Amino acid sequence: MTKMVFQKQILKDINWQIASEDCWLLTGPSGSGKTMLLRLILGLEKPDSGSVNLLGDYKYASVNAGVVFQEDRLCEQFSALENVAMVNERLSEMVAGEELSKFLPQERLTVPVCELDPVERRLVVMIRACIIPSDILLLDEPFRGMDSDLRDKVIAYIRDKAGHKGIVFVQQDDSGLEFCRKFVL
């Protein structure tokens, strides 16, 4: 697969297989195309040549993924509880609250996310991605702003919630992710 942006080749001859239950670290220097590759996997961009097939012969028009983008994509006026519960209609607010309480104090669950600090917002986004019914988790810089203790706790949570799903972490370094297979751009 190849992708060009503004007449500059961002990705060239990419051939990467991600199977269910795989855990990958997509890494490389800033500007190497990591986020673009995620956008291609998600179907948000089209390759200039080649194709994207995920988890074998994928039969759907789009990827069924839990996603953490680089920027926190939240409904700003809704609470953390509402932001998490809204992505899974089978999930009660009580269960959403239990998941959030693993990382946030109870009193922070019901305030609008626009009032949360950047790390709290990142935790809401990460929890939401993990509870969406999906085949794979795609996590772009999911630990931004977190110290190593919190990062390690979040990694354990992600691995637990992923179950048999594939996971792709996107980061410039492998801190805490030494257990992942690496794909370097």
Predicted regions and their residues:
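Conserved ABC transporter NBD signature motif
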Residues: G50-V63
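Conserved ABC ATPase signature
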Residues: P112-E120
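Q-loop/switch helix immediately C-terminal to the Walker
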Residues: E71, Q77-V95
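ABC-family nucleotide-binding domains
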Residues: D140, D147
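Helix-to-loop junction immediately C-terminal to a conserved catalytic motif
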Residues: L42
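Conserved ABC ATPase "signature" region
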Residues: E93-R108
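Hydrophobic anchor residue at the start of the ABC signature
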Residues: M126
